[in-house]
């Protein structure tokens, strides 16, 4: 065994070879040294266990190939572009909404240049970083003011911490939601230092339940939109309109966590109806929070709109600075919101709406092209079909609703295994992510952003 250890080259010997010098030129001295040490450590452990040299140390050429391979993997970006063929348009694990071209350009400009983030160009003095977007949101929603933080969970936390610390927040039992990542409304309330007061039952809550729970220690009445589940059957709930009337009567503000946050009526596009921010403001809600990267189709952000007196208090809270967005996110958000000033062009300019409203005819054409390319690459190892599919919006939006779609399905035909094919899909330069259902791989075209790039990627198979 000692003789085997002696056959291992030293780091210094590797570095002084022509191949070693080439590796240093390509990857840098520090990275090459670290990789050599790592592989030598692994080789010593292998020798102890197997009493033989690992193959990649059997000759110098193999050794340098192994070092080069490790260095290449180390340099690869791990958050990489994928082809979304899951049928879930706003897929949380795949990054939710795609940014519009306008948002991308605005963000790129903010990255490369100094921008008027907190500077009033007209007055020539400092301003607030939310000002530009606040003006836009007021125009779009009818609210008096707006506040921007880094996601909707942060928006909820900020509202609770600002107005309800040490006080009571009244909410229906049927709205004590949990969303992805174990985010629970009661847990956020506990973190904010407020006291949860549950009213009603899971399936039925009445206005009198809220009224009877109000005390002099009540901070506000809270409504949470149940976007990621539905309670059906024998149910009853209280609308924001009813709740705001009660709030005005009892001098208690009303807050709504809308979650997905649509700014247009989706039913006009043949999609499931989702309550809009404008509707909640019109119903008299004091504060409405929602996400920027769900139905809005933009960047990850938490947006709060509502009465000016309440927004000013949010802006003054110390947590606001902790939760604020940077210039890139704000630039992308502003550009996204400006698209809503021309709603007639939204399905053309906003990727989320473009994907959700693609006609089935176009999806069938894309499916035929995809099937043809797959058949040419897989050599009859699998059975491929074009089938009707059911896509979904995703990210907790309309979980019970499905959108007609088209998919290419792949089933086992010979000894070739779907699991092996799925693994091959994930090893491509731009991995292909589909879904497994009924013993088949489903490649749903509804959620695919670019058919041409996908077809080019498949040439790697």
Curated annotation (Swiss-Prot):
Annotated positions of the N6-(pyridoxal phosphate)lysine modification: 294
UniProt main location, coarse: cytoplasm
Enzyme class: transferase
Enzyme Commission number(s) of this protein: 2.9.1.1
GO cellular component terms, A-Z: cytoplasm
Annotated family: Belongs to the SelA family.
Protein name: L-seryl-tRNA(Sec) selenium transferase
Protein encoded by which gene: selA
């Amino acid at each position: 065994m000692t003789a085997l250890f002696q056959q291992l080259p030293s780091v210094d010997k590797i570095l002084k070879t022509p191949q070693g010098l080439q590796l240093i030129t390509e990857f840098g001295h520090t990275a090459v040294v670290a990789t050599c040490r790592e592989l030598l450590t692994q080789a010593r452990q292998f020798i102890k266990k197997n009493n033989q040299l690992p193959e990649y140390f059997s000759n110098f050429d193999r050794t340098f190939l192994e070092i080069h391979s490790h260095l290449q993997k180390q340099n690869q970006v791990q958050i990489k572009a994928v082809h979304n063929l899951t049928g879930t348009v706003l897929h949380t694990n795949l990054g939710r909404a795609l940014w519009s071209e306008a948002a991308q350009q605005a963000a790129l400009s903010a990255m490369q240049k100094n921008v008027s983030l907190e500077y009033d160009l007209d007055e020539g003095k400092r301003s607030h970083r939310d000002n530009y977007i606040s003006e836009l949101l007021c125009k779009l929603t009818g609210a008096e003011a707006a506040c921007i933080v880094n996601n909707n969970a942060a928006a909820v936390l900020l509202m609770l911490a600002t107005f309800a610390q040490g006080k009571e927040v009244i909410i229906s039992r049927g709205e004590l939601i949990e969303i992805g990542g174990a985010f629970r409304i009661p847990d956020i309330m506990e973190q904010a230092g407020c006291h949860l007061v549950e009213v009603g039952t899971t399936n039925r809550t009445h206005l009198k339940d809220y009224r009877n729970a109000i005390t002099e220690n009540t901070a506000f009445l809270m409504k949470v939109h149940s976007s990621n589940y539905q309670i059906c059957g024998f149910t009853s709930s209280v609308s924001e309109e009813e709740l705001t009337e009660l709030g005005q009567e009892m001098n208690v503000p009303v807050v709504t966590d809308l979650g997905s946050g649509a700014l247009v009526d989706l039913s006009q596009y043949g999609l499931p109806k989702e309550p809009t921010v404008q509707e909640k403001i019109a119903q008299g809600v004091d504060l409405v929070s929602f996400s920027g990267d769900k139905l809005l189709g933009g960047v990850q952000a938490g947006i709060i709109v509502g009465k000016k007196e309440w927004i000013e208090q949010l802006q003054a809270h110390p947590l606001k600075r902790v939760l604020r967005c940077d210039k890139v996110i704000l630039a992308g958000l502003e550009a996204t919101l400006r698209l809503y000033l021309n709603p007639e062009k939204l399905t053309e300019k906003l990727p989320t709406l473009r994907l959700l409203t693609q006609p089935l005819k176009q999806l069938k054409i894309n499916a035929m092209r995809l099937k043809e390319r797959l058949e040419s690459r897989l050599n009859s190892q699998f059975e491929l079909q074009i089938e009707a599919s059911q896509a979904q919006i995703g990210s907790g939006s309309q979980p019970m609703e499905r959108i007609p779609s088209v998919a290419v399905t792949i089933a086992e035909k010979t000894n070739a295994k779907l699991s092996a094919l799925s693994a091959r899909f994930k090893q491509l330069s731009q991995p292909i992510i589909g879904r497994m259902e009924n013993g088949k791989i489903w490649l749903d075209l509804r959620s695919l952003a670019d058919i041409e790039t996908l077809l080019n990627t498949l040439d790697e198979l």
